[in-house]
């Protein structure tokens, strides 16, 4: 037989392909976005439709074990995450919008004009009847770029990729109209020419919460904004600020203002045919709205939950509540159960609630007067605060998403709520959660009688939750250790410490009297025992921090080994005390 022929030589390698064109803003040679590829899904709903087709086909042809479970799992993931993974909320302070509009309109006095005048100008901008004198104003570029980015992102990642547009420090209807005007100027419009964003005013201070109903009434009556709401399904998102309202008026005044605002806005929305969705801007500490989510939901006004709950979870509590699968499921289960109970609760008010509201209003007013009298109206208190707390250390820590202060002012008003609360928890005083509470309760008992206030604290979920929260902070506070911090203030110690200590004891005595107990947390053995076990480890850190603060300040506050040791004590105390920021 003839030998086999020799093997054919290998084919020459193909020529090196030319580099792929880069997408706008992408690195050289990067692949084009999948959304731009031929045959790509336009949005997640198309992908879901195909997955459901596969699922039904497997079910019809006995293919359960040929991938049915995997398909259902992928279906759930697409339903939860779409093509975007997580929705991104947008947030900007109203003053930034006003500054941008002043530049675009070439009107430096625009922010100072009455809100009614600003609102009319903004309506004209939304309608396109008012030309913009300086559409390329550089001072407005940063604000407009946000809307341009949204306009580019929505077609690519889907409508669920962008959440609410939150306007912090909202004070009038003009603040919401400003978002619509800027969105149009930035080209952020859908196929119907509407702004594809939920505009969410954020009411933060006690005064702004009190005025929230008037603001929304003006918005619901505004034809331009009402048309926007119709495009958004007649659903209005409102964010409620727990942090700044408590810093502004104390815990009782803040909680009462939030309660009243929800009652008023729920009724107003029902009257206007709008479904209202409250977004609770809660923090990790009691002074910033923290606490047990389930109890807070059940204590919400009747009709305000309506099957919906949205709230912020702070970074320092996410791991504690959701870091372990079993804990995450338990927390979500408790929140879901609370929403169901609150939603199914009869809308008919409790017969005693009118009297309770009168008492709560009086207690809140007295508590706020005492709180503001010390914090905002007493000369020298800011200096005492800066000496008796480690605020000068906290201001240097790079742990927040925003600067510790608004602007360059040095008073309490300019300080953000997070460092304000954090500083008072570090020195073991917890003042932000109970200052004024004792005065308010004592005056309420004197005016309405002990039995009436005790009944309210027992039977009204709103007030019972408030009293329990304050009791927990009192149990975590240690006036003996706080006194050592207070002495760092020199002459300020003799001036301020006695009054603070007296209010602490007044609050403690009033709560024990209302509950008919001898000791704090008598009804919560697990929490009381947890505090007793943690404190022996936290106390040495607190004493060490006092010593380090004195030495570091005497040395001129350098960023040296003393400072780094102070940072370590801050972290340790925060971990031990919990509910700190």
Question: Where do the PLM segments sit?
Answer:
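Conserved, mostly hydrophobic/aromatic
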Residues: 82, 201, 284
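Acidic, glycine-enriched catalytic cores built around paired aspartates
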Residues: 84, 89-91, 96-98, 110-135, ...
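Catalytic cores of alpha/beta
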Residues: 211-215, 288-296
